[in-house]
């Protein structure tokens, strides 16, 4: 899919829905929201109890009556209604009105036409705006300040929570790409397994993630 800078330049919001975290950026302001992609609901009436960081803190601690889920899997919607509820709340935090909003929403390069349409439908249901899909490697390159329209090829490796995408981009498009379901979440599980095997100690996902960030980051986070 060829990237359209003219459409992208007119967008109000940039939205990245990841398996682990959701980020929203505003034109001219940069990232204005970063929250976990987690939703907690009451299993009896399906009412949303908590979203984002509050919901993430409930993982492994919630009673049986509360279901804590990640509605995004591998960059693709796995629970439409919960994703709508989550994104609706997030968007309302960063804009006063949803009228006239145009958003650029990140989608995996390997996403099918059905998956892309589902992402657009979800965004429209959440805040009723025009949606411009942007392939994940292109969005990552733009975020790094690379000139995606130059004839010089760039290799982009984007490791998220549920998937890692590797792509070669040039002249505003993706020349070749590969997506693998081996990323940050799997790293966390490997850390949990190692600590249990090495020290016979059981740690949770939040602790494993913190270990990964503190030890595995090339730059302080």
Question: What is each residue range found by the language model?
Answer:
Residues 1-159, 167-221:
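Nucleotide/phosphate-binding catalytic cleft detector across ATP-hydrolyzing
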């Amino acid at each position: 899919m060829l990237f359209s800078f003219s459409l992208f330049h007119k967008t109000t919001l940039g939205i990245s829905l990841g398996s682990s975290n959701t980020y929203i950026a505003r034109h001219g302001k940069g990232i204005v929201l970063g929250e976990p992609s987690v939703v907690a609901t009451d299993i009896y009436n399906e009412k949303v109890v908590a979203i984002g960081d509050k919901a993430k803190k409930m993982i492994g601690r919630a009673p049986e009556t509360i279901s804590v889920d990640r509605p995004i899997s591998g960059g693709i919607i796995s629970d439409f209604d919960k994703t709508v509820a989550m994104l609706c709340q997030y968007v309302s935090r960063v804009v006063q009105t949803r009228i006239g909003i145009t958003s650029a929403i990140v989608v995996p390069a390997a996403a099918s036409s059905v998956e892309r349409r589902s992402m657009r439908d979800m965004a429209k249901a959440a805040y009723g705006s025009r949606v411009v899909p942007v392939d994940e490697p292109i969005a990552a390159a733009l975020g790094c300040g690379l000139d995606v329209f130059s004839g010089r090829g760039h290799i982009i490796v984007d490791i998220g929570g549920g998937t890692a995408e590797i792509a070669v981009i040039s002249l505003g498009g993706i020349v070749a790409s590969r997506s693998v379901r081996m990323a940050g979440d799997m790293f966390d599980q490997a850390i949990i397994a190692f600590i249990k095997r090495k020290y016979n100690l059981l740690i949770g996902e939040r602790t494993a993630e913190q270990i990964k960030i503190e030890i595995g980051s090339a730059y302080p986070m």
